[in-house]
């Protein structure tokens, strides 16, 4: 995108609630555009999701994929309907297909307390919440998508963790944390895994520690914890960095 060009966004409303929430999401972007100098959005809507699959046999047409390739960003609504499934009984999920097409390996999910909204987390109202979950979105069990083996008696999926994808996830996460610190926000990067049980996750944690050693001392402190511990930790804390 050139400096004077509009920011082109591919809009994929999806199904059900996705269609419902897309309209106010676009209104928010339009208000941002109206109050921000030199910022212009260009929206192009395209089909994707379970309803499109039911009508055409494809989760999204080639024209949608081409649009996503050419756009600066993709604004994606919720996709999938429990009553509409592939022959293997899995749901229609173009959002996952897009991850593989465009190597969208880092799923960034910020969590903040909305003023006035109640929270089940102890002390949240007084201490606040500022938590960002960064999840690898193309490997793990996602790598087995469409490849699992199901028999009458059992089902098997293969979990995959590679050094290449893990290291770029960690590098992204450290840089993200450093940017937060530069803005004056609290920051601590924690690797959450199942290294206490599985060799694959012990490998994952080992690579995380190796990556942490490559960053300067100014980088926020790091740590690791298993998922059960993480769940208890989050449930009992009013704030996380």
What residue ranges belong to the model's regions?
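Glycine-rich phosphate/diphosphate-binding loop of Rossmann-like nucleotide-binding domains
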Residues: 4, 10-36, 151-228
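Short coil/turn connectors at secondary-structure junctions
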Residues: 4-8, 39, 69-73, 104, ...
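N-terminal beta-loop-helix "entrance" segment that forms/cooperates
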Residues: 38-61, 231-233
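General small-molecule cofactor/ligand-binding pocket signal
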Residues: 42-46, 109, 190, 222-224
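Acidic, glycine-rich active-site loops and adjacent beta-strand->loop/helix elements
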Residues: 47-54, 80-82, 195-198, 227-229
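N-terminal glycine-rich phosphate/adenylate-binding segment common to multiple enzyme folds
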Residues: 53-159
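Glycine-rich phosphate-binding loop
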Residues: 65-83, 218-241
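Short, well-ordered secondary-structure micro-motifs
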Residues: 144, 200-202, 233-235
